Amino acid sequence: MVAVIIKGNEVAEKKRAQLKEEVVKLKEQGIVPGLAVILVGEDPASRSYIKGKQKGCEQVGIYSELIEFPDTITEERLLAEIDRLNEDDRINGILVQLPLPKHIEEKAIIERISPKKDVDGFHPINIGRMMTGQDTFLPCTPHGILELVKETNIDISGKHVVVIGRSNIVGKPVGQLFLNENATVTYCHSKTKNIKELSKLADILVVAVGRPKMVTADYIKEGAVVIDVGVNRLETGKLCGDVDFENVLDIAGYITPVPKGVGPMTITMLLHNTVESAKRAGFICK
Protein backbone atom coordinates (compact mmCIF):
# COMPACT_ATOMS: atom_id res chain seq x y z
CA MET A 1 0.00 0.00 0.00
CA VAL A 2 1.30 3.44 -0.93
CA ALA A 3 -0.06 6.43 0.98
CA VAL A 4 -2.30 8.99 -0.66
CA ILE A 5 -0.43 12.30 -0.70
CA ILE A 6 -2.51 15.16 0.71
CA LYS A 7 -1.45 18.04 -1.52
CA GLY A 8 -1.84 21.07 0.70
CA ASN A 9 -1.09 23.49 -2.12
CA GLU A 10 -4.05 22.16 -4.14
CA VAL A 11 -6.41 22.25 -1.15
CA ALA A 12 -5.24 25.80 -0.40
CA GLU A 13 -5.88 26.93 -3.98
CA LYS A 14 -9.39 25.49 -3.89
CA LYS A 15 -10.18 27.30 -0.64
CA ARG A 16 -8.67 30.56 -1.93
CA ALA A 17 -10.93 30.37 -4.98
CA GLN A 18 -13.91 30.09 -2.63
CA LEU A 19 -12.64 33.04 -0.57
CA LYS A 20 -12.23 35.12 -3.73
CA GLU A 21 -15.90 34.55 -4.56
CA GLU A 22 -16.90 35.56 -1.02
CA VAL A 23 -14.82 38.74 -1.25
CA VAL A 24 -16.49 39.68 -4.55
CA LYS A 25 -19.90 39.38 -2.86
CA LEU A 26 -18.73 41.43 0.12
CA LYS A 27 -17.43 44.18 -2.15
CA GLU A 28 -20.83 44.31 -3.86
CA GLN A 29 -22.19 45.25 -0.43
CA GLY A 30 -19.49 47.88 0.10
CA ILE A 31 -17.35 45.74 2.40
CA VAL A 32 -13.63 45.43 1.59
CA PRO A 33 -11.77 43.04 3.93
CA GLY A 34 -8.53 44.61 5.17
CA LEU A 35 -5.42 43.11 6.77
CA ALA A 36 -2.65 45.12 8.46
CA VAL A 37 0.73 43.44 8.90
CA ILE A 38 3.36 44.94 11.22
CA LEU A 39 7.03 44.13 10.60
CA VAL A 40 9.67 45.15 13.15
CA GLY A 41 13.26 44.98 11.93
CA GLU A 42 14.77 43.41 8.82
CA ASP A 43 14.65 39.66 9.44
CA PRO A 44 14.80 38.06 5.95
CA ALA A 45 12.64 35.09 6.96
CA SER A 46 9.95 37.39 8.37
CA ARG A 47 9.97 39.48 5.20
CA SER A 48 9.63 36.32 3.12
CA TYR A 49 6.63 35.16 5.17
CA ILE A 50 5.00 38.56 4.79
CA LYS A 51 5.42 38.47 1.01
CA GLY A 52 3.47 35.21 1.00
CA LYS A 53 0.70 36.83 3.02
CA GLN A 54 0.58 39.88 0.75
CA LYS A 55 0.43 37.66 -2.32
CA GLY A 56 -2.44 35.70 -0.78
CA CYS A 57 -4.35 38.90 -0.01
CA GLU A 58 -3.90 40.11 -3.58
CA GLN A 59 -5.03 36.74 -4.92
CA VAL A 60 -8.39 36.78 -3.11
CA GLY A 61 -9.00 40.54 -3.17
CA ILE A 62 -8.20 41.51 0.42
CA TYR A 63 -6.78 45.00 1.01
CA SER A 64 -3.42 44.66 2.75
CA GLU A 65 -1.24 47.22 4.46
CA LEU A 66 2.37 46.65 5.53
CA ILE A 67 3.58 48.82 8.40
CA GLU A 68 7.33 48.69 9.00
CA PHE A 69 9.34 49.82 12.02
CA PRO A 70 13.06 49.63 12.85
CA ASP A 71 14.09 47.11 15.49
CA THR A 72 14.82 50.04 17.81
CA ILE A 73 11.11 50.86 18.17
CA THR A 74 9.90 51.03 21.76
CA GLU A 75 7.22 48.71 23.07
CA GLU A 76 5.13 51.78 23.93
CA ARG A 77 5.23 53.02 20.31
CA LEU A 78 4.30 49.59 18.95
CA LEU A 79 1.38 49.34 21.37
CA ALA A 80 0.21 52.78 20.23
CA GLU A 81 0.24 51.61 16.60
CA ILE A 82 -1.88 48.59 17.51
CA ASP A 83 -4.31 50.89 19.33
CA ARG A 84 -4.61 52.97 16.15
CA LEU A 85 -5.29 49.90 14.01
CA ASN A 86 -7.84 48.60 16.50
CA GLU A 87 -9.86 51.77 15.82
CA ASP A 88 -9.35 51.78 12.03
CA ASP A 89 -12.57 50.59 10.36
CA ARG A 90 -10.71 49.72 7.14
CA ILE A 91 -8.75 47.05 8.98
CA ASN A 92 -10.43 43.77 9.90
CA GLY A 93 -7.30 41.84 10.82
CA ILE A 94 -4.07 42.81 12.60
CA LEU A 95 -1.00 40.60 12.41
CA VAL A 96 2.31 41.31 14.13
CA GLN A 97 5.05 39.26 12.48
CA LEU A 98 6.98 37.29 15.08
CA PRO A 99 9.61 37.09 16.45
CA LEU A 100 10.00 40.58 17.90
CA PRO A 101 13.19 42.18 19.28
CA LYS A 102 14.10 41.01 22.79
CA HIS A 103 13.23 44.34 24.42
CA ILE A 104 9.58 43.98 23.35
CA GLU A 105 7.32 41.57 25.23
CA GLU A 106 5.44 39.48 22.66
CA LYS A 107 2.70 38.61 25.15
CA ALA A 108 1.88 42.29 25.73
CA ILE A 109 1.74 42.95 21.98
CA ILE A 110 -0.52 39.97 21.21
CA GLU A 111 -2.88 40.85 24.05
CA ARG A 112 -3.17 44.47 22.85
CA ILE A 113 -4.72 43.38 19.53
CA SER A 114 -8.51 43.51 19.70
CA PRO A 115 -9.90 39.94 19.86
CA LYS A 116 -12.24 41.03 17.03
CA LYS A 117 -9.19 41.63 14.79
CA ASP A 118 -6.95 38.82 16.07
CA VAL A 119 -6.84 36.87 12.80
CA ASP A 120 -3.79 34.89 13.98
CA GLY A 121 -5.97 33.41 16.72
CA PHE A 122 -3.34 34.03 19.41
CA HIS A 123 -5.24 36.32 21.81
CA PRO A 124 -6.00 34.62 25.16
CA ILE A 125 -9.71 35.40 24.76
CA ASN A 126 -9.84 33.64 21.39
CA ILE A 127 -7.77 30.73 22.73
CA GLY A 128 -10.29 30.42 25.58
CA ARG A 129 -13.19 30.45 23.14
CA MET A 130 -11.48 27.73 21.10
CA MET A 131 -10.93 25.64 24.24
CA THR A 132 -14.63 25.81 25.08
CA GLY A 133 -15.77 25.11 21.53
CA GLN A 134 -17.16 28.60 20.85
CA ASP A 135 -17.14 30.33 17.47
CA THR A 136 -13.87 32.27 17.20
CA PHE A 137 -10.77 32.86 15.10
CA LEU A 138 -8.84 29.60 15.12
CA PRO A 139 -5.01 29.60 15.02
CA CYS A 140 -4.06 29.36 11.36
CA THR A 141 -1.72 26.35 11.22
CA PRO A 142 -3.86 24.11 13.48
CA HIS A 143 -6.98 25.10 11.54
CA GLY A 144 -5.19 24.31 8.28
CA ILE A 145 -4.19 20.89 9.63
CA LEU A 146 -7.79 20.11 10.59
CA GLU A 147 -8.98 21.09 7.11
CA LEU A 148 -6.37 18.84 5.48
CA VAL A 149 -7.51 15.86 7.55
CA LYS A 150 -11.12 16.60 6.63
CA GLU A 151 -10.07 16.43 2.96
CA THR A 152 -9.52 12.68 3.44
CA ASN A 153 -13.25 12.30 4.28
CA ILE A 154 -12.26 10.23 7.31
CA ASP A 155 -14.70 10.57 10.22
CA ILE A 156 -12.59 12.20 12.95
CA SER A 157 -15.07 11.40 15.73
CA GLY A 158 -13.79 8.54 17.87
CA LYS A 159 -10.37 8.44 16.21
CA HIS A 160 -7.16 8.43 18.25
CA VAL A 161 -5.08 11.51 17.44
CA VAL A 162 -1.48 11.66 18.63
CA VAL A 163 0.26 15.05 18.56
CA ILE A 164 4.06 15.05 18.84
CA GLY A 165 4.92 18.58 19.99
CA ARG A 166 3.34 20.95 22.51
CA SER A 167 4.04 24.48 21.26
CA ASN A 168 1.46 27.18 21.91
CA ILE A 169 1.29 27.92 18.18
CA VAL A 170 0.71 24.40 16.80
CA GLY A 171 0.89 21.44 19.19
CA LYS A 172 -1.44 22.50 22.00
CA PRO A 173 -4.16 24.12 19.86
CA VAL A 174 -4.26 21.43 17.16
CA GLY A 175 -4.94 18.79 19.80
CA GLN A 176 -7.79 20.92 21.14
CA LEU A 177 -9.32 21.29 17.67
CA PHE A 178 -9.36 17.51 17.25
CA LEU A 179 -10.83 17.15 20.75
CA ASN A 180 -13.60 19.54 19.67
CA GLU A 181 -14.25 17.10 16.80
CA ASN A 182 -14.75 14.28 19.35
CA ALA A 183 -11.39 12.61 18.79
CA THR A 184 -9.36 11.06 21.62
CA VAL A 185 -6.12 13.05 21.86
CA THR A 186 -2.69 12.10 23.21
CA TYR A 187 0.14 14.65 23.47
CA CYS A 188 3.80 13.60 23.25
CA HIS A 189 6.76 15.88 23.95
CA SER A 190 10.42 15.90 24.93
CA LYS A 191 9.69 14.36 28.35
CA THR A 192 7.48 11.56 26.98
CA LYS A 193 9.32 8.27 27.46
CA ASN A 194 7.48 6.03 25.00
CA ILE A 195 6.80 8.28 22.01
CA LYS A 196 7.28 5.53 19.44
CA GLU A 197 4.82 3.19 21.14
CA LEU A 198 2.21 5.93 21.58
CA SER A 199 2.52 7.27 18.04
CA LYS A 200 1.99 3.77 16.67
CA LEU A 201 -1.49 3.83 18.25
CA ALA A 202 -2.49 6.91 16.24
CA ASP A 203 -5.20 6.86 13.60
CA ILE A 204 -4.11 10.45 12.93
CA LEU A 205 -0.54 11.53 13.73
CA VAL A 206 0.48 15.20 13.80
CA VAL A 207 4.23 15.87 14.07
CA ALA A 208 5.46 19.39 14.93
CA VAL A 209 8.84 19.27 16.66
CA GLY A 210 11.41 20.73 14.23
CA ARG A 211 13.62 17.62 14.04
CA PRO A 212 14.43 16.47 10.49
CA LYS A 213 13.06 13.02 9.60
CA MET A 214 12.56 12.08 13.26
CA VAL A 215 9.48 9.95 12.59
CA THR A 216 10.15 6.77 10.64
CA ALA A 217 7.99 3.82 9.58
CA ASP A 218 8.25 2.14 12.99
CA TYR A 219 6.31 5.08 14.50
CA ILE A 220 3.35 4.59 12.17
CA LYS A 221 0.21 2.48 12.44
CA GLU A 222 -0.68 0.95 9.09
CA GLY A 223 -3.16 3.17 7.24
CA ALA A 224 -2.73 6.17 9.57
CA VAL A 225 -3.12 9.79 8.47
CA VAL A 226 0.27 11.49 8.92
CA ILE A 227 0.43 15.29 9.06
CA ASP A 228 3.98 16.67 8.94
CA VAL A 229 4.20 20.26 10.20
CA GLY A 230 8.00 20.48 10.36
CA VAL A 231 10.03 22.50 7.88
CA ASN A 232 13.76 21.81 8.14
CA ARG A 233 16.62 22.65 5.79
CA LEU A 234 19.26 19.96 5.32
CA GLU A 235 22.94 20.70 4.67
CA THR A 236 22.25 20.06 0.98
CA GLY A 237 19.81 22.97 1.03
CA LYS A 238 16.83 20.68 0.49
CA LEU A 239 13.73 21.11 2.65
CA CYS A 240 12.37 18.18 4.63
CA GLY A 241 9.82 17.62 7.36
CA ASP A 242 9.87 15.97 10.77
CA VAL A 243 8.69 12.75 9.08
CA ASP A 244 10.95 10.59 6.91
CA PHE A 245 8.57 10.86 3.95
CA GLU A 246 9.96 8.09 1.72
CA ASN A 247 10.34 5.71 4.65
CA VAL A 248 6.75 6.21 5.82
CA LEU A 249 5.09 6.31 2.39
CA ASP A 250 4.46 2.56 2.19
CA ILE A 251 2.77 2.20 5.58
CA ALA A 252 0.71 5.40 6.03
CA GLY A 253 -2.76 5.73 4.52
CA TYR A 254 -2.43 9.47 3.92
CA ILE A 255 0.54 11.81 4.30
CA THR A 256 1.35 15.49 3.75
CA PRO A 257 4.56 16.36 1.89
CA VAL A 258 7.13 19.02 2.78
CA PRO A 259 7.02 21.48 1.11
CA LYS A 260 3.50 21.97 -0.35
CA GLY A 261 1.75 20.31 2.56
CA VAL A 262 0.70 22.19 5.69
CA GLY A 263 2.52 25.45 4.80
CA PRO A 264 0.14 26.73 2.08
CA MET A 265 -2.83 26.14 4.39
CA THR A 266 -1.48 28.42 7.12
CA ILE A 267 -1.73 31.56 4.99
CA THR A 268 -5.03 30.41 3.50
CA MET A 269 -6.60 30.15 6.96
CA LEU A 270 -5.25 33.63 7.77
CA LEU A 271 -7.11 34.90 4.70
CA HIS A 272 -10.19 32.96 5.83
CA ASN A 273 -10.08 34.62 9.27
CA THR A 274 -9.71 38.08 7.72
CA VAL A 275 -12.77 37.54 5.51
CA GLU A 276 -14.74 36.22 8.51
CA SER A 277 -13.75 39.31 10.50
CA ALA A 278 -15.00 41.55 7.69
CA LYS A 279 -18.31 39.67 7.65
CA ARG A 280 -18.71 40.13 11.39
CA ALA A 281 -17.85 43.83 11.18
CA GLY A 282 -20.47 44.25 8.44
CA PHE A 283 -22.96 41.92 10.17
CA ILE A 284 -22.98 39.56 7.19
CA CYS A 285 -24.33 36.08 7.94
CA LYS A 286 -22.50 33.05 6.60
Curated annotation (Swiss-Prot):
NADP(+) binds at residues 165-167, 190, 231. CDD domains: NAD_bind_m-THF_DH_Cyclohyd. Pfam families: THF_DHG_CYH, THF_DHG_CYH_C. It comes from the Bacteria. GO terms for molecular function: methenyltetrahydrofolate cyclohydrolase activity; methylenetetrahydrofolate dehydrogenase (NADP+) activity. Pathway: One-carbon metabolism; tetrahydrofolate interconversion. Gene3D superfamilies: Leucine Dehydrogenase, chain A, domain 1, NAD(P)-binding Rossmann-like Domain. One of its GO terms (biological process) is tetrahydrofolate interconversion. One of its GO terms (cellular component) is cytosol. Belongs to the tetrahydrofolate dehydrogenase/cyclohydrolase family. Homodimer. Catalyzes the oxidation of 5,10-methylenetetrahydrofolate to 5,10-methenyltetrahydrofolate and then the hydrolysis of 5,10-methenyltetrahydrofolate to 10-formyltetrahydrofolate. NCBIfam families: PRK10792.1, PRK14186.1. This is Bifunctional protein FolD. The lineage of its organism: Bacteria, Bacillati, Bacillota, Bacilli, Bacillales.
